[in-house]
Amino acid sequence: MIALYPGSFDPITLGHLDVIERASRLFSKVIVAVLKNPNKTPLFSPEQRQAQISLSTAHLKNVEVDTFSGLTVAYARQRGAKVIVRGLRVLSDFDVELQMAHTNKLLAPELETLFLATASEHSFVSSSLVKEVAKLGGPIDHLVPAPVIRDLRERFPLA
């Protein structure tokens, strides 16, 4: 069965990677789909984020990384996915994710949403937090995979 894990991943964090690794054990194929959102100004281009995720998941042979725009359910159908995977960090994530899951179910009744609770050591990590810490020159090696550390240090050189 094919699962889709969509997101902006700007950048991918160790929390995202944890969800990807766990989903890869549950499904025959996991497509990590980087959303091209015209309403956001990302730090990294969709192609850079795709490359970061590809390097970070190279050890997972059943994981594919792609980019998409538009409705997640339309992309899921196009790729033959039956499940949308979402990670939950805190209770407030659940409110937003549940609304999205209900909307997706209305638009595509054949798709299921699977929520995976993030490992406790990653429950505080967000892409926004990572960017802020990196911008201020703080340590990020416990927050993001190695390929992202390099890219963030190029973007925000240490003083």
Curated annotation (Swiss-Prot):
Q: What is its EC number?
A: 2.7.7.3
Gene Ontology annotations for the cellular component aspect, listed alphabetically: cytoplasm
Identify the Pfam families for this entry.
CTP_transf_like
> What GO terms are given for molecular function?
ATP binding; pantetheine-phosphate adenylyltransferase activity
**GO biological processes:** coenzyme A biosynthetic process
Q: Spell out the reaction equation it catalyses.
A: (R)-4'-phosphopantetheine + ATP + H(+) = 3'-dephospho-CoA + diphosphate
Protein's UniProt keywords contain Cell cycle: no
Residues that, per the record, bind ATP? S8, F9, H16, G87, L88, R89, E97, H122, S123, F124, V125, S126, S127, S128
Task: Give the multimer and partner information.
Answer: Homohexamer.
Subcellular location field: Cytoplasm
Q: What PANTHER family does the entry give?
A: PHOSPHOPANTETHEINE ADENYLYLTRANSFERASE
- The annotated site for Transition state stabilizer falls at H16
Q: Which UniProt keywords apply?
A: ATP-binding, Coenzyme A biosynthesis, Cytoplasm, Magnesium, Nucleotide-binding, Nucleotidyltransferase, Transferase
Q: What does this protein do?
A: Reversibly transfers an adenylyl group from ATP to 4'-phosphopantetheine, yielding dephospho-CoA (dPCoA) and pyrophosphate.
What is the protein's given name?
A: Phosphopantetheine adenylyltransferase
First-level EC class: transferase
The record's similarity note reads: Belongs to the bacterial CoaD family.
Cofactor(s) it depends on: Mg(2+)
Q: What is the lineage of its organism?
A: Bacteria, Bacillati, Cyanobacteriota, Cyanophyceae, Synechococcales
Where does this protein act, in terms of pathway?
A: Cofactor biosynthesis; coenzyme A biosynthesis; CoA from (R)-pantothenate: step 4/5
Is this entry keyworded Transmembrane helix?
no
Report residues binding substrate: S8, K40, T72, R86
